[in-house]
UniProtKB/Swiss-Prot annotation:
<feature type="topological domain" description="Cytoplasmic">
    <location>
        <begin position="131"/>
        <end position="132"/>
    </location>
</feature>
<dbReference type="GO" id="GO:0044167">
    <property type="term" value="C:host cell endoplasmic reticulum membrane"/>
</dbReference>
<comment type="function">
    <text>Participates in the transport of viral RNA to the plasmodesmata. TGBp3 most probably contains signals of plasmodesmata targeting is therefore involved in the targeting of TGBp2, and viral RNAs-TGBp1 (RNP complex), to plasmodesmata. Can gate plasmodesmata and increase their size exclusion limit.</text>
</comment>
<keyword id="KW-0812">Transmembrane</keyword>
<keyword id="KW-1038">Host endoplasmic reticulum</keyword>
<dbReference type="GO" id="GO:0016020">
    <property type="term" value="C:membrane"/>
</dbReference>
<dbReference type="Pfam" id="PF06358">
    <property type="entry name" value="BNYVV_TGB3"/>
</dbReference>
<feature type="transmembrane region" description="Helical">
    <location>
        <begin position="110"/>
        <end position="130"/>
    </location>
</feature>
<feature type="topological domain" description="Cytoplasmic">
    <location>
        <begin position="1"/>
        <end position="11"/>
    </location>
</feature>
<comment type="subunit">
    <text>Interacts with movement proteins TGB1 and TGB2.</text>
</comment>
<keyword id="KW-0813">Transport</keyword>
<comment type="similarity">
    <text>Belongs to the benyvirus TGB3 movement protein family.</text>
</comment>
<dbReference type="GO" id="GO:0044219">
    <property type="term" value="C:host cell plasmodesma"/>
</dbReference>
<protein>
    <recommendedName>
        <fullName>Movement protein TGB3</fullName>
    </recommendedName>
</protein>
<keyword id="KW-1031">Host cell junction</keyword>
<dbReference type="InterPro" id="IPR010470">
    <property type="entry name" value="BNYVV_TGB3"/>
</dbReference>
<keyword id="KW-1133">Transmembrane helix</keyword>
Amino acid sequence: MVLVVKVDLSNIVLYIVAGCVVVSMLYSPFFSNDVKASSYAGAVFKGSGCIMDRNSFAQFGSCDIPKHVAESITKVATKEHDADIMVKRGEVTVRVVTLTETLFIILSRLFGLAVFLFMICLMSIVWFWCHR
C-alpha cells in the first residue's frame, strides 16, 4: 500500500501566511496582555515590582497596597499626568508615565494592529489566488 500525499505550493504559502497571522496576533503589543513597567500608563512602584492602574486600581506583580493608599496616590498622579511625579507614601515611590511614553505606546499598538491587518489581507489574497 502506497500513501500518496499531494503537496501544492499554494497550500504551503497559505499555511505560512496563516502562521504569521497567528504569531503577529499573539506577540503584537496591540493584543498583548503583558504589563511592562517601562510602557504602561499607570503608576510604577519602583523596587517592589508592582504596577498599578490609575483608573481601576488593579495591581500587577508583587503588590500588597491598601486601597486607600492606592486611591491617594492615584489622585495625585492624575492631576499632573503630563510630567514625571515622585510621590512618597511611606516607602512607595510612584512614577507617572510621561506624554512621550504614552504616545510611543499608542504608536506601537497602532503598528501592531497595522501588521495584523496586513497579514489578514495577505492571507485573503493568497486564499483567493489559490481558489480562483
